[in-house]
From Swiss-Prot:
Pathway: Carbohydrate degradation; glycolysis; pyruvate from D-glyceraldehyde 3-phosphate: step 1/5. Pfam families: Gp_dh_C (PF02800), Gp_dh_N (PF00044). Keywords: Cytoplasm, Glycolysis, NAD, Oxidoreductase. GO terms for molecular function: glyceraldehyde-3-phosphate dehydrogenase (NAD+) (phosphorylating) activity; NAD binding; NADP binding. The keyword NAD applies. NCBIfam families: GAPDH-I. One of its GO terms (cellular component) is cytosol. D-glyceraldehyde 3-phosphate binds at S150, C151, T152, T181, T210, G211, R233. This is Glyceraldehyde-3-phosphate dehydrogenase. It is found in: Cytoplasm.
């Protein structure tokens, strides 16, 4: 039976989670809340997407609801999560994709309106974090709020796990060359907390902070304190790439490491999550790719048997949203068994 889901926040991730839910098949989005978009604009924003193209199915308004492919979706415009009537719409699970309510306490406000569980589509300071293919076995049905971590952590963690399981990571540094996101400025503008982040997104390569590498230590405890990293924001609309440099305990040639990753990508745990390519790829080749991470065999290099650079691509919108759907589906299945 399909999982009944509500989406709070109909921005980039909210809309692409909905597109993925339609493809996913066992997720039924029954409600959307966004106080900043009216229903007509919601239809337009969902149908037309500069990055992922025009939605090919039917999108219309009927009886005050958003109707996609004939399925009605209740639309709310509440600013306070506690006031959203998820229960009345039949939504058991809420995808919290505003980027605002990312703590356990704030996300739990959704429960007041009748939701049973909340999945935050962002890293959280205190909610348990899960990465598909890495630590789903640690999920406990008693959790009411969970985080799907970040798009970059979803790219890095499966790759890091394979390397750590086979060669033991001593320490490492990650750089993500990251596509522009909605929080950036089209031209120079005020950004008090991050001065460089306020510079025009289309005109600059912008160094930025990211907690993605440190967060790997939360989903793989044996890597805690062994990884950190930074980001460069670049003027592309979508698709990012992780550059991971690690020192490994068990020496291996780059060819051996490639073969290990290739084999791991074909296992049931990582199939479709960690992909492998030998092709001469560039970023746009991954637009709309649903994998969390695609290892670029031609992109990496090793200095010696213990020091290696690994490169892995990810569609930071589409791939991440696919994992949000997978996580919702997984926890619903576990909850049903509890």
């Amino acid at each position: 039976m399909a999982v009944k889901v509500g989406i709070n926040g109909f921005g980039r991730i909210g809309r692409i989670v909905l597109r993925n839910a339609i493809i996913h098949g066992d997720i039924d989005v029954v409600a959307i809340n966004d106080p900043f978009i009216d229903l007509e604009y919601m239809v337009y924003m969902f149908k037309y997407d500069s990055t992922h193209g025009v939605f090919k199915g039917s999108v219309e308004i009927k009886d005050g609801k958003l109707v996609i492919e004939g399925k009605p979706i209740v639309v709310y415009g509440e600013r306070d999560p506690a006031n959203i009537q998820w229960g009345a719409a039949g939504a058991d699970y809420v995808v919290e994709s505003t980027g605002v309510f990312t703590t356990q306490e704030k996300a739990e406000l959704h429960l007041k309106g009748g939701a049973k569980k909340v999945v935050i589509s962002a890293p959280s300071a205190d909610a348990p974090m899960f990465v598909c293919g890495v630590n789903l076995d640690k999920y406990d049905p008693k959790y009411t709020v969970v985080s799907n971590a970040s798009c970059t952590t979803n790219c890095l963690a499966p790759l890091g796990k394979v390397i750590h399981d086979n060669y033991t990571i001593v320490e490492g540094l990650m750089t993500t060359v990251h596509a522009t996101t909605a929080t950036q400025k089209t031209v120079d503008g005020p950004s008090n907390k991050d001065w460089r982040g306020g510079r025009g997104a289309g005109a600059n390569i912008i160094p930025s902070s990211t907690g993605a590498a440190k967060a790997v230590g939360k989903v793989i405890p044996s890597l805690n304190g062994k990884l950190t990293g930074m980001a460069f924001r670049v003027p592309t609309p979508d698709v990012s790439v992780v550059d991971l440099v690690v020192r490994i305990e068990k020496g291996a040639s780059y060819e051996e490491i490639k073969e290990t990753i290739k084999k791991a990508s074909q296992t049931p745990e990582l199939k479709g999550i960690l992909n492998y390519t030998d092709d001469q790829v560039v970023s746009t080749d991954f637009t709309g790719d649903s994998a969390s991470s695609t290892f670029d065999a031609q992109g990496g290099i090793s200095l010696n048997g213990n020091f290696v650079k690994l490169v892995s691509w990810y569609d930071n919108e589409w791939g991440y949203s696919a994992r949000v759907c997978d996580l919702v589906s997984y926890i619903a299945a576990q909850d049903a068994k509890a």
